[in-house]
Amino acid sequence: MSEISVIILAAGFGTRMKSKKAKVLFELCGEPMLFHILKKAYEITDNVNVVLHYDFENIKNIVLSKFPNVKIYKQDHENFPGTAGALKNINLNSQKTLIICGDMPLVKTAELKKLCKGETDINLSVFYAENPFGYGRVINKNGKILKIVEQKDANEQELKENCVNAGAYCFKTDILKQILPLIKNENSQKEYYLTDAIEIALQKKLKCQAIEVAEENFMGINDKFALSKAETIIQNEIKENLMKNGVLMRLPESIYIDSRAKFIGECELHENVSIIGSCVIENSIIKSSSVIENSHIINSDIGPMAHIRPDCEISDTHIGNFVELKKAKVNKIKAGHLSYLGDCEIQEGTNVGCGTITCNYDGKRKYRTKIGKNVFIGSDTQLVAPVEIQDNVLIAAGSTITKNVEEGSLAISRIKQENKPGFFAKFFKEIK
């Protein structure tokens, strides 16, 4: 039997999000909010459970793809709605059971561990709210907790209380098993509230303790405004940690960094940069208004206003303004401006001229372009894939390359220029 099990309640409909998408799947810094909570749970125990209902199969598959050992349960919402109803069919097999909500991504592991300490029968997380509206009130008399009343069921006097339920509990599991069958749905919503467990426990002379936690860490995400507030908080935490560990950021408040991104060595991010997905940035400079997605960048400078799309590997390279790469593997090259390099491999010493395009799509499928070492590509060149350019090749500006080019060659593909003397005056005279 494990010492602690964690149960994450994620069965709610999330109607205030005003979306068909399940609330716990809304992303914060690149990952679903439920993932943020699951990571914290696994820092406490390997015995982690999630209760779902709405969009069950979809959420289940998404969770198991990242956390394959999570035990997933489906709430019988028709017969047992509410937070206590969510626990009806769970296999409770630990000494203590920590119960947390799936919409509290800001919760800290240290506070959850504090909630699990001690020998009391029930530990309840509370905070003193400046504005308690919407929270369940923790009703007490002379410091003794009497009960928890939901906002919609509280009377006028109870609504004046500002000690509120933060939404996390730690039960001795044997106590939880005793209390769950005793919880009734005698309230305005006809739901089974886990908060009623406190009142039942006190009637049984069990020991209940309020554990004060930080309000900002237990903020529930109930609408998209709260979602934006939570993402701002997580962004600030990510950037503060990175800057303290050596990443230089200019105007950090304008920068977006995915929670999965990694930075190695001495890196620099300029204003309005977005780092999206599982990027790895090593000893590189990302200049103003550039976007990097799911790519690995080493010893390079990118931008300003460059777009590095997914699955790029860039090393010892200069990528300039208005250059877009996608599924590109490039090493020790220069692409200064206004180019699209997709589905390609470019080797060291190559210079990509302004306006170069790898034409990688024929309307049915994608094709790759291979470019060797020390290739000079003139401006306004189109490389129609599939095509291979071998080493030491010069491609004349304005060329459309449709055939492979052998090593050491000049490739030129354009109409011969013809000048017609006196044409300007003749042409405009006819117009008049």
From Swiss-Prot:
Q: Where is this region: N-acetyltransferase?
A: 246-432
Q: Where is this region: Linker?
A: 225-245
| Gene Ontology BP term (one) | cell wall organization
Q: Where in the cell is it found?
A: Cytoplasm
Q: From the record, give the transmembrane residue ranges.
A: none
| Top-level division of the source organism's lineage | Bacteria
| Co-factor: note | Binds 1 Mg(2+) ion per subunit.
List the GO cellular component terms.
Answer: cytoplasm; membrane
Instruction: Give the EC number.
Output: 2.7.7.23, 2.3.1.157
Q: Which residues form the active site?
A: 337 (proton acceptor)
Q: Which UniProt keywords apply?
A: Acyltransferase, Cell shape, Cell wall biogenesis/degradation, Cytoplasm, Magnesium, Metal-binding, Multifunctional enzyme, Nucleotidyltransferase, Peptidoglycan synthesis, Repeat, Transferase
Recorded GO MF terms: glucosamine-1-phosphate N-acetyltransferase activity; magnesium ion binding; UDP-N-acetylglucosamine diphosphorylase activity
Q: What is its main location?
A: cytoplasm
Q: Which InterPro entries match?
A: Bifunctional_GlmU (IPR005882), GlmU-like (IPR050065), GlmU_C_LbH (IPR038009), Hexapep (IPR001451), MobA-like_NTP_Trfase (IPR025877), Nucleotide-diphossugar_trans (IPR029044), Trimer_LpxA-like_sf (IPR011004)
| Cofactor(s), by name | Mg(2+)
Q: Where does UDP-N-acetyl-alpha-D-glucosamine bind?
A: 9-12, 23, 82-83, 136, 150, 165, 222, 309, 326, 340, 351
**Where along this sequence does the record place binding of acetyl-CoA?**
360-361, 379, 397, 414
Pfam families membership: Hexapep, NTP_transf_3
Region Pyrophosphorylase: start-end pairs: 1-224
- Which pathway or pathways does this protein act in? Nucleotide-sugar biosynthesis; UDP-N-acetyl-alpha-D-glucosamine biosynthesis; N-acetyl-alpha-D-glucosamine 1-phosphate from alpha-D-glucosamine 6-phosphate (route II): step 2/2; Nucleotide-sugar biosynthesis; UDP-N-acetyl-alpha-D-glucosamine biosynthesis; UDP-N-acetyl-alpha-D-glucosamine from N-acetyl-alpha-D-glucosamine 1-phosphate: step 1/1; Bacterial outer membrane biogenesis; LPS lipid A biosynthesis
Residues annotated as binding Mg(2+) are 103, 222
Q: Which family does it belong to?
A: In the N-terminal section; belongs to the N-acetylglucosamine-1-phosphate uridyltransferase family.
Subunit relationships: Homotrimer.
UniProt function note: Catalyzes the last two sequential reactions in the de novo biosynthetic pathway for UDP-N-acetylglucosamine (UDP-GlcNAc). The C-terminal domain catalyzes the transfer of acetyl group from acetyl coenzyme A to glucosamine-1-phosphate (GlcN-1-P) to produce N-acetylglucosamine-1-phosphate (GlcNAc-1-P), which is converted into UDP-GlcNAc by the transfer of uridine 5-monophosphate (from uridine 5-triphosphate), a reaction catalyzed by the N-terminal domain.
Official protein name in the record: Bifunctional protein GlmU
Q: State the gene name recorded for this protein.
A: glmU
